């Protein structure tokens, strides 16, 4: 089972240095409150370190991934994911099997842009952010690494 990282952009583009903008484009996070799911690797960790003041990330569990996938829509028809859509496009029998294959690393969500609209668009967190978005999470802020607590933020943003 591979570790999946949920990455959410929490700050806008005004005043962003060019190299951070390029990194955010590579991570496919063009706007505020966009989210992507990647497998944990050294190249992704390097990009996260560069773009740290503009994003927050952590390890996804199965519940957090299911919540994120509820916001995923098909490219053709703008439909939410159902078992019928998964059968016709990806030849996968059920939604739960789809989630399991992503968690096991058999399917990479960021490579399914032929079928789905990526990045995943989220709402601002209900109740607002608990800290300042220009402070690290470790100092009662919002940006940077937050571990398993990313799932709580996703729950509030879906």
From Swiss-Prot:
Gene3D superfamilies: 1.10.15.30, Ribosomal protein L30, ferredoxin-like fold domain
CDD domains, per database record: Ribosomal_L7_archeal_euk
Keywords linked to the UniProt accession: Ribonucleoprotein, Ribosomal protein
GO MF assignments: RNA binding; structural constituent of ribosome
Transmembrane segments: none
Biological processes per GO annotation: maturation of LSU-rRNA from tricistronic rRNA transcript (SSU-rRNA, 5.8S rRNA, LSU-rRNA); translation
InterPro entries membership: Ribo_uL30_ferredoxin-like_sf (IPR036919), Ribosomal_uL30 (IPR039699), Ribosomal_uL30_arc (IPR005997), Ribosomal_uL30_euk_arc (IPR035808), Ribosomal_uL30_ferredoxin-like (IPR016082)
Pfam families in the record: Ribosomal_L30 (PF00327)
GO cellular component, one term: cytosolic large ribosomal subunit
Subunit structure and binding partners: Part of the 50S ribosomal subunit.
UniProt record similarity statement: Belongs to the universal ribosomal protein uL30 family.
Protein name: Large ribosomal subunit protein uL30
């Amino acid at each position: 089972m591979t570790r999946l990282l949920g990455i959410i952009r929490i700050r806008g583009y005004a005043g962003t240095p060019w190299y951070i903008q390029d990194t955010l484009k590579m991570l496919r996070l063009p706007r505020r409150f966009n989210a992507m799911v990647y497998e944990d690797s050294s190249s992704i960790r390097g990009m996260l370190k560069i773009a740290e003041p503009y994003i927050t990330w952590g390890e996804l569990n199965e519940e957090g991934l299911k919540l994120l996938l509820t916001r995923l829509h098909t490219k053709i028809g703008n439909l939410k994911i159902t078992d019928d859509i998964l059968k016709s496009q990806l030849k996968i029998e059920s939604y739960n099997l789809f989630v399991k294959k992503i968690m096991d690393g058999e399917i990479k969500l960021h490579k399914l842009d032929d079928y789905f609209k990526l990045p995943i668009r989220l709402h601002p967190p209900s109740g607002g952010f608990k800290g300042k978005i220009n402070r690290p999470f470790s100092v009662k802020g919002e940006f940077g690494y937050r571990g398993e607590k990313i799932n709580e933020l996703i729950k509030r943003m879906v």
